[in-house]
């Protein structure tokens, strides 16, 4: 019998990785709350956001979480960062988490400032840490679905858990590199979305590639400072989970965070831009948490602060840009 993997969350990213695992020969059961989405997947055998990609026969769908996780040797999540707490609470009523649990979402919880892995540990208890894994890196879902080469990192606290997850996801075209700095991997994936919004704003004003490269470089500097204060390894941020993911998200026309920033530059409000994108914009969610944490720890993060103020304090976007451009320049160091 084929080894079973449960996949929680069937947005385009969840569908993408669930399809990858199905093609590797696993029996994958994808769970989603939305009964209409599940019915569409079951009857049309296409995902609405990837209608040109047929569903692999090893991949099935359900709205019943018990059915999804029963007998699974691994559980993978791809819900929004705002959704991981309620989904984890629901999962806790079903299992005590005795198999690898892989987080593939990117964000920081608002108001608590917790990483997604920390939310899971809070709900399941400290013993859950040994089963936690985190997959992150430059991975646009549509490119992965098409079979384009891609490199990501997987991190876990426990060596056996890391080995199992690494084996499950690795393919000749989906290159998976182990990394022991789980917190750094998580922060790199979360914070780069804020910088991507700034790059989208730059695109919206047609500031050009020079300006965008400056934002990416200074944005990486902000991310590194933040992660260092949070006891992460700085070198993690120069790898796939940091610089790699940052470049892809900031320069890809498929990035929803960059497209969101472009809409903000065009005069859309926060809610209008989110509605126009039609999918979760994690950078908008994370900007609030990152700003609050940076303020508490007195971390100077001018790009993050500017995005927060534009989105949540109604700062005029041109004033925000002017404030960034008028800052004193200091000796560059990374």
From Swiss-Prot:
<keyword id="KW-0443">Lipid metabolism</keyword>
<feature type="binding site">
    <location>
        <position position="257"/>
    </location>
    <ligand>
        <name>sn-glycerol 3-phosphate</name>
    </ligand>
</feature>
<feature type="binding site">
    <location>
        <position position="192"/>
    </location>
    <ligand>
        <name>sn-glycerol 3-phosphate</name>
    </ligand>
</feature>
<protein>
    <recommendedName>
        <fullName>Glycerol-3-phosphate dehydrogenase [NAD(P)+]</fullName>
        <ecNumber>1.1.1.94</ecNumber>
    </recommendedName>
</protein>
<feature type="binding site">
    <location>
        <position position="141"/>
    </location>
    <ligand>
        <name>NADPH</name>
    </ligand>
</feature>
<dbReference type="InterPro" id="IPR011128">
    <property type="entry name" value="G3P_DH_NAD-dep_N"/>
</dbReference>
<dbReference type="GO" id="GO:0047952">
    <property type="term" value="F:glycerol-3-phosphate dehydrogenase [NAD(P)+] activity"/>
</dbReference>
<dbReference type="Pfam" id="PF07479">
    <property type="entry name" value="NAD_Gly3P_dh_C"/>
</dbReference>
<feature type="binding site">
    <location>
        <position position="139"/>
    </location>
    <ligand>
        <name>sn-glycerol 3-phosphate</name>
    </ligand>
</feature>
<feature type="binding site">
    <location>
        <position position="106"/>
    </location>
    <ligand>
        <name>sn-glycerol 3-phosphate</name>
    </ligand>
</feature>
<dbReference type="GO" id="GO:0005829">
    <property type="term" value="C:cytosol"/>
</dbReference>
<feature type="binding site">
    <location>
        <position position="33"/>
    </location>
    <ligand>
        <name>NADPH</name>
    </ligand>
</feature>
<feature type="binding site">
    <location>
        <position position="256"/>
    </location>
    <ligand>
        <name>NADPH</name>
    </ligand>
</feature>
<feature type="binding site">
    <location>
        <position position="280"/>
    </location>
    <ligand>
        <name>NADPH</name>
    </ligand>
</feature>
<comment type="function">
    <text>Catalyzes the reduction of the glycolytic intermediate dihydroxyacetone phosphate (DHAP) to sn-glycerol 3-phosphate (G3P), the key precursor for phospholipid synthesis.</text>
</comment>
<keyword id="KW-0594">Phospholipid biosynthesis</keyword>
<dbReference type="InterPro" id="IPR036291">
    <property type="entry name" value="NAD(P)-bd_dom_sf"/>
</dbReference>
<keyword id="KW-0560">Oxidoreductase</keyword>
<keyword id="KW-0520">NAD</keyword>
<dbReference type="GO" id="GO:0046168">
    <property type="term" value="P:glycerol-3-phosphate catabolic process"/>
</dbReference>
<keyword id="KW-1208">Phospholipid metabolism</keyword>
<feature type="binding site">
    <location>
        <position position="13"/>
    </location>
    <ligand>
        <name>NADPH</name>
    </ligand>
</feature>
<feature type="binding site">
    <location>
        <position position="106"/>
    </location>
    <ligand>
        <name>NADPH</name>
    </ligand>
</feature>
<comment type="similarity">
    <text>Belongs to the NAD-dependent glycerol-3-phosphate dehydrogenase family.</text>
</comment>
<dbReference type="InterPro" id="IPR008927">
    <property type="entry name" value="6-PGluconate_DH-like_C_sf"/>
</dbReference>
<dbReference type="Pfam" id="PF01210">
    <property type="entry name" value="NAD_Gly3P_dh_N"/>
</dbReference>
<feature type="active site" description="Proton acceptor">
    <location>
        <position position="192"/>
    </location>
</feature>
<keyword id="KW-0521">NADP</keyword>
<dbReference type="InterPro" id="IPR006168">
    <property type="entry name" value="G3P_DH_NAD-dep"/>
</dbReference>
<comment type="pathway">
    <text>Membrane lipid metabolism; glycerophospholipid metabolism.</text>
</comment>
<feature type="binding site">
    <location>
        <position position="282"/>
    </location>
    <ligand>
        <name>NADPH</name>
    </ligand>
</feature>
<dbReference type="GO" id="GO:0005975">
    <property type="term" value="P:carbohydrate metabolic process"/>
</dbReference>
<dbReference type="GO" id="GO:0051287">
    <property type="term" value="F:NAD binding"/>
</dbReference>
<keyword id="KW-0444">Lipid biosynthesis</keyword>
<feature type="binding site">
    <location>
        <position position="245"/>
    </location>
    <ligand>
        <name>sn-glycerol 3-phosphate</name>
    </ligand>
</feature>
<feature type="binding site">
    <location>
        <position position="255"/>
    </location>
    <ligand>
        <name>sn-glycerol 3-phosphate</name>
    </ligand>
</feature>
<dbReference type="GO" id="GO:0046167">
    <property type="term" value="P:glycerol-3-phosphate biosynthetic process"/>
</dbReference>
<keyword id="KW-0963">Cytoplasm</keyword>
<dbReference type="GO" id="GO:0006650">
    <property type="term" value="P:glycerophospholipid metabolic process"/>
</dbReference>
<dbReference type="GO" id="GO:0008654">
    <property type="term" value="P:phospholipid biosynthetic process"/>
</dbReference>
<feature type="binding site">
    <location>
        <position position="137"/>
    </location>
    <ligand>
        <name>sn-glycerol 3-phosphate</name>
    </ligand>
</feature>
<dbReference type="InterPro" id="IPR013328">
    <property type="entry name" value="6PGD_dom2"/>
</dbReference>
């Amino acid at each position: 019998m084929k080894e079973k993997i449960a996949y929680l969350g069937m947005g385009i990213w969840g569908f993408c990785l669930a399809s990858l695992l199905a093609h590797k020969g696993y029996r994958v059961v994808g769970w989603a709350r939305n009964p209409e989405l599940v019915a569409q997947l079951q009857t049309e055998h296409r995902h609405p956001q990837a209608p040109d990609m047929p569903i692999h026969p090893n991949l099935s769908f359900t709205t019943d979480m018990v059915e999804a996780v029963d007998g699974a040797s691994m559980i993978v999540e791809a819900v929004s960062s705002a959704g991981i707490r309620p989904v984890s609470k629901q999962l806790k009523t079903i299992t005590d988490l005795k198999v690898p649990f892989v987080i593939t979402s990117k964000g920081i919880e608002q108001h608590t400032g917790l990483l997604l892995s920390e939310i899971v540990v809070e709900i399941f208890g400290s013993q859950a840490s040994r089963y936690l894994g985190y997959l992150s890196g430059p991975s646009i879902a549509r490119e992965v679905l098409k079979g384009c080469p891609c490199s990501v990192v997987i991190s876990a606290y426990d060596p056996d858990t890391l080995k199992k997850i690494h084996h499950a996801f690795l393919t000749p075209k989906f290159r998976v590199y182990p990394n022991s700095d789980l917190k750094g991997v998580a922060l790199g994936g979360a914070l780069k979305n804020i910088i991507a919004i700034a790059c989208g704003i730059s695109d919206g004003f047609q500031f050009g590639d020079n300006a965008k490269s400056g934002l990416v470089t200074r944005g990486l500097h902000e991310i590194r400072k933040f992660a260092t204060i949070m006891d992460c390894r700085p070198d993690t941020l120069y790898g796939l989970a940091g610089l790699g993911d940052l470049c892809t998200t900031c320069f890809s026309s498929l990035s929803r965070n960059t497209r969101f920033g472009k809409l903000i530059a065009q005069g859309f409000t926060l809610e209008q831009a989110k509605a126009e994108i039609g999918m979760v914009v994690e950078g908008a969610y994370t900007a609030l948490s990152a700003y609050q944490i940076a303020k508490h720890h007195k971390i100077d993060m001018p790009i993050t602060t500017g995005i927060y103020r534009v989105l949540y304090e109604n700062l005029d976007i041109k004033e925000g840009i002017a404030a960034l451009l008028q800052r004193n320049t200091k000796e560059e160091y990374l």
